[in-house]
């Protein structure tokens, strides 16, 4: 199987996000890489589901709360940017202050 660098990145995000989701379900708090992967995956899947950039930017601030991440993580994550494929092309989605 031959994958482009972008496809490899998406698979890595998926793997890390799956791990993060499982840890959340077990009641564990996410660390920095898990938090970023979880948020990034939500954007990628939302784009795949047909949501708009503005919709994802708005929803992105509700996906994780301070109680779901380790201490200090909300202060480290000021924004998350990820390129996602939408029906009308690839767009950059930026979520400001995603962990409330």
Curated annotation (Swiss-Prot):
The keyword Hydrolase applies. Its main location: cytoplasm. Pathway: Nitrogen metabolism; urea degradation; CO(2) and NH(3) from urea (urease route): step 1/1. GO terms for biological process: urea catabolic process. Its EC number is 3.5.1.5. SUPFAM superfamilies: Urease, gamma-subunit. Heterotrimer of UreA (gamma), UreB (beta) and UreC (alpha) subunits. Three heterotrimers associate to form the active enzyme. This is Urease subunit gamma. It comes from Prochlorococcus marinus (strain MIT 9312). The gene is ureA.
């Amino acid at each position: 199987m031959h994958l482009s660098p972008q496809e490899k990145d998406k698979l890595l995000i998926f793997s890390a996000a799956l791990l993060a989701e499982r840890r959340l379900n077990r009641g564990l708090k996410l660390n920095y890489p898990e938090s970023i992967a979880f948020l990034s995956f939500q954007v990628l899947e939302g784009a795949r589901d047909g949501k708009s950039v503005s919709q994802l930017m708005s929803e992105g601030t509700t996906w994780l709360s301070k109680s779901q991440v380790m201490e200090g993580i909300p202060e480290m994550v000021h924004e998350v940017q990820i390129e996602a494929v939408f029906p009308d092309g690839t767009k950059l989605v930026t979520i400001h202050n995603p962990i409330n």
